[in-house]
A protein has these predicted regions:
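Amphipathic, well-ordered alpha-helical segments in soluble domains
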Residues: 25-28, 110-117, 136, 143
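N-terminal regulatory/effector-sensing and dimerization cores
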Residues: 1-96
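N-terminal/domain-start segments enriched in small and hydrophobic, helix-friendly residues
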Residues: 1-7, 74-125, 193-195, 242
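Short hydrophobic/aromatic patch on the recognition helix
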Residues: 48, 194-198, 243-248
Length: 267
């Protein structure tokens, strides 16, 4: 039986593993399955499928289960590379209309063929030599633009987020585990302006509000839907189960496990 594989080949500059998408990312799932939550929607990829997670959005990949197979290739289209590409190829941008945070691209034989052509470039560690990063990223980007010219309006839009409705944005995105300065940037504000506007709306500091909202959701999920604490803490924006349990008890006077056990006895 084949051993479970959870492997990622990254082509491009290193990226910080966080729930803020700082650069455009092209995903190709070589084998297995992967899923994630980008913007306000769930997405899933199966073997041979691919898509683009767009920059300046919030998103997270669901952790692979113990026996799952997930082998994927990620191309990072960072801004310096895209600017150089645009200058070299004299790209004329078109208007890009989709607001989706994760773009499922239509099936086309060119993409799998390109991925297959990477085979000879892998070293013994299963990685592609950095000397070929730009060449291969350029080749893939040319294919994508040939298949969907309107993607030029996505890749070559170097603008920064504009000021938006902070209350609506936070009520929609508070479960994402990102630093407050990321929330400020995505709402088109400096950090000081964000904190000032936030307090004027919610009458609470961002950090306290975020923890309280996440814990209130946790209480409802455990009490009403009988969810297990270990199954929900990551989706609610907590990094560690121990921190989640400590914060939960401080707010509600009992641990999430105690609440779950009480609910189980009542069933």
């Amino acid at each position: 039986m084949k051993a479970p594989v959870n492997k990622t080949c990254l082509i491009g500059p290193a990226i910080v593993r966080e729930q803020f998408v700082a650069e455009h990312l092209f995903f190709y799932l070589v084998e297995g399955a992967m899923s994630g939550y980008y913007g306000s929607k769930n997405y899933a990829l199966q073997s041979g499928e691919y898509g683009v997670a767009r920059k300046n959005r919030l998103g997270r990949q669901n952790p692979a289960k113990e026996n799952d197979i997930a082998e994927k290739i990620i191309f990072v289209f960072d801004e310096p590379f895209l600017r150089s590409f645009q200058e070299k190829h004299v790209i004329v941008t078109t208007h890009f209309t989709s607001e989706e945070s994760f773009l499922r691209l239509p099936d086309n034989a060119l993409i799998p063929g390109f991925i297959h052509s990477l085979g000879p470039y892998y070293n013994r560690q299963g990685e592609i030599d950095r000397a070929f990063f730009d060449v291969k990223r350029e080749e893939l980007l040319l294919i994508l633009l040939q298949l969907q010219p309107e993607l030029s309006g996505l890749f070559f839009d170097f603008g920064i987020p504009q000021k938006i409705d902070l209350e609506e944005f936070m009520n929609r995105n508070y479960r994402f585990n990102v630093h407050i300065d990321r929330f400020a940037y995505l709402t088109g504000r400096s950090l000081s302006a964000y904190k000032r506007d936030f307090y004027a709306i919610f009458h609470e500091t961002p950090s306290r509000w975020l923890v309280r909202k996440r814990l209130e959701d946790a209480y409802s999920l455990i009490d009403k839907q009988h969810k297990k604490p270990a199954d929900i803490y990551l989706d609610l924006g907590f990094e560690a189960l121990s921190h989640f349990s400590f914060a939960f008890k401080r707010l509600f006077g009992q641990t999430p496990t105690e609440l779950a056990e009480r609910g189980n006895r009542a069933i």
